[in-house]
């Protein structure tokens, strides 16, 4: 449907019998009205043509081949000169065969049938509106018992009988005789109501505004009473208040959407278009049919049997009619939702039939797989991995995926730079992966964002924009801070990448969807780009260091081996294999790590600026080492102080690791960047 703003939308809800009839009925040019499916047949076993008034009837749903009727005659579609527009012999219109994808039919039910979604799904809408237990309504719907009291607002035999203050002795003999007379059928239809018809009458008598008002009054009265002191009674009152709130919300929803409650009971059953429940011929001449066709056949068989019983009601016992009504109700329940009442219906191979609910719901349903999960151009999919060196707004795009996504842009670049004379030559260069192709691709992606999406997209942050960079391999690299917004894990999750083509889409991606502009949760406002499991584990490994203390290094058995220590002299640092190295700056330490001279967790001594907290420390040195020139080293647990002969502090070294240095530098750069941003803002 299209709303007043010309937005296409799909809404699922209850519709009136008149609307179902308008969807399915159509008037042929000769004035004949078709649309009702009355026969449970599909194709004739000899001619392989659809049966008339069956589940694949061409009069109801349109021709199988465009412009060809059931008789084999052909007419040009859309030619106004061709007259008539339908075959007078078979009644099939000369229209496009695609009409069989949306033309519906209907089954006129011999008795009202409740929609199982509104009765059995929790919460039960019918039970909430009628304010009755679900078990009682189920017994009424499936004809397990009847209402032995008047349903309609009119004087009845049972109502008059209950108004007398005394019993007439003769009634003990007259009433049993009355039940055995021929007029009992009239009495039964008037005084006793059962099945979905009784539910429909009760729903039709409801006034939704009165229900809302009475429920609100009762809710206020329960709220004014206060706690009773009895835990069981308080819980009962709480459940009643919750029920009243749900009932008011449901009644308001019906009023707001102009839906009548009695529409939850079906009188006309829609029949899906044939192309949505096809019968396909496979190798060997065998036919494969949708399970919905078999469920429709079951409904039509039982409905036709009930119709025959009702036409011969004088000679048919009432119990037989009620039993057949129950079978019709169960058949419709199985069609709509197989297994909702317990044991699902199975075929001859013990395979469960797929009902209408099974077709549309779930990951492989019609909506998520076919309508929402369509394959689109300029998109790809791959596994995500951590990209720790990436900026927050960047993502690593594999080269092979990027060359496919941006192939048209690369072709345009090759032609504009006169590196290819036409599209064919440009595609040939791309297939051969010439070096110039990667240069042009690098220029293209610099100004073109991409969208990353992880299904299911449950909120706005499920799809975000990134600036791509080319990476090797086949996996998409992602900054770990954006993981929480996607609700993704780096354990094999896949994400889809899309290329926004129009200028409007690219502007929206840059202004609204970039990851560094979505740092807060749109739902509660809390920070969503926070360190999570992967980053915390990485920081732990980065800063864990070597657990051995400074004392343990002196008595390490490895130090007792007799071999000459290799000493490496440099202007920036002094390093020996057996002793912990000394560095003058963090850049020297990181350079030694890149040259693989030290490990990430290897302890080292780093020259540090004077710190008053260190000088004022009352810690007793573990060891004091004197040199020949009179200077000496005071060695503490995590730092050492070099003093002169006059006990002046010459320099300070702290005991740390390369991991700690890297972590400290990242924090320092972040603080400096924040301070610069604040200074620019002021």
From Swiss-Prot:
The top EC class, named as a word, is: transferase
* Localisation: Plastid, Chloroplast
- A Gene Ontology cellular-component term: chloroplast
In this chain, Zn(2+) is annotated as bound at: 69, 71, 87, 90
* Keyword line: Chloroplast, DNA-directed RNA polymerase, Magnesium, Metal-binding, Nucleotidyltransferase, Plastid, Transcription, Transferase, Zinc
- Which reactions fall under this protein's catalytic activity? RNA(n) + a ribonucleoside 5'-triphosphate = RNA(n+1) + diphosphate
Protein name in the entry? DNA-directed RNA polymerase subunit beta'
This chain's source organism reads Platanus occidentalis (Sycamore)
Task: Give the encoding gene's name.
Answer: rpoC1
